[in-house]
């Protein structure tokens, strides 16, 4: 099959690369190309395969976390480091079709469509790592432990499915852990991010009072997608939110603590909950002059947290039950995420550029491996 990869032109012969393209991601040149991948062998008689399945990736998408991995791989290739590989695959969300099953697999069948189950932090099987299932969804073929995928319903299309797992599992966990009351006022920061979008849509489905904070202009269609949430725009790089009339909230969801934590804390009510699942500057090249990452307000922040009995919660992905719940609540008429663009394998640069360089992007960019 044809698969998209970051390619090392110093190590991979030109004849092995089709549709070579270059794009810039925050100052790093990333070279993408299409390579041939053969179906891996899978011996169902081998006991080592008993609890595993072989999956053909039908479509995949990238998350913010993949950006740093892509940039790091490209930097290694560009600097000709000895540890650089000929190709580097990427992508952590996918939908795939099971093509082979091991003898010990009972709940999954050949032909089933599945998505990754990134359960964390609790182990479900000895020797099977928790957390993100793969960083190489673009490889096209994946051999995975049976616990690391879940089947999806027919009414979830491939494009939503390829964008679903990490955002849905993370948002489901964050909402569960905040013990939200029906009267709580909720703020979601960086609201165009994929995780924030999942959070907003899930909260609205339950009837909560949601305010979404953004630094971008939204179209009417985009505002309609999150209605009746109140969308408030602030200037990008604003050092303090004191000059805007935000008010107070009982719960604040924030995907980027290094950008927003210091400004969030003063806007929490007594016994308020702040929860975060990540940070923006996962690589030094991601840092911008307008980022407010001051540490000299830390003492004031902790004083406010102590005086007001605040809860500061860190969240990493979620449990299997969190993902099962998100799948069970999925409504094709009210999807939790928009699909911004769908491209095929021969549009690798467009896929990466749209995913990471377009501030106007609203939702996920999906690459399909289906004809």
Residue locations for each model-derived region?
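Glycine-rich beta-strand-centered segment in the early N-terminal region that forms part
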Residues: 43-61, 74-123
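NAD(P)H dinucleotide-binding glycine-rich loop of Rossmann-like/cofactor-binding domains
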Residues: 84, 92, 117-190
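N-terminal Rossmann-like NAD(P) cofactor-binding module of classical short-chain dehydrogenase/reductase
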Residues: 115, 252-253
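Mid-domain Rossmann-like dinucleotide-binding core that forms the NAD(H)/NADP(H) cofactor-binding site
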Residues: 162-238
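C-terminal hydrophobic helical "lid"/dimerization subdomain
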Residues: 173, 319-371
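Glycine-rich phosphate-binding loop and adjacent beta-alpha segment
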Residues: 206-208, 259-336, 368-371
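Short amphipathic alpha-helix with an adjacent loop that forms part of the alpha/beta core around
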Residues: 237-247
